[in-house]
């Protein structure tokens, strides 16, 4: 799994755990819904660290805690 896929899976997991939808995550985070849906789009390869931080802030989750999960263990190398 690449980092983009792991980030998307982690945000979807957090939304599910909190019972919120992606558009609600956007509102909580002060970003547009299109920003969140663009990040979730599998055809997009990039995810901004600034966006990740804003979404974590909206969830009141430290960014270090966001990345400290088994989903981020054993990621594929991004340089090809």
Where are these predicted regions, by residue range?
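Short, charged recognition helix plus adjacent turn
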Residues: 1-2, 38, 64-80
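A short, Lys/Arg-rich alpha-helix, primarily the initiator
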Residues: 1-20
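Residues within the helices of the helix-turn-helix
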Residues: 12, 23, 53
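The alpha-helix within a helix-turn-helix
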Residues: 15, 26, 56
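Short coil turns linking two alpha-helices in DNA-binding domains
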Residues: 21, 32-33, 48, 62
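Recognition helix of helix-turn-helix/homeodomain-like DNA-binding domains
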Residues: 30-46
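Short, basic-rich loop-to-helix N-cap that marks the start of a DNA-contacting helix
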Residues: 43-57
């Amino acid at each position: 799994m690449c980092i983009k896929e792991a980030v998307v899976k982690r945000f979807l997991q957090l939304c599910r755990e909190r019972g919120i939808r992606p558009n609600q995550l956007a509102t909580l985070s002060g970003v547009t819904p299109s920003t969140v849906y663009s990040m979730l789009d599998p055809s997009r390869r990039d995810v901004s660290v600034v966006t990740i931080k804003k979404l974590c802030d909206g969830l009141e989750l430290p960014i270090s805690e966001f990345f400290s999960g088994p989903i981020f263990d054993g990621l594929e190398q991004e340089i090809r």
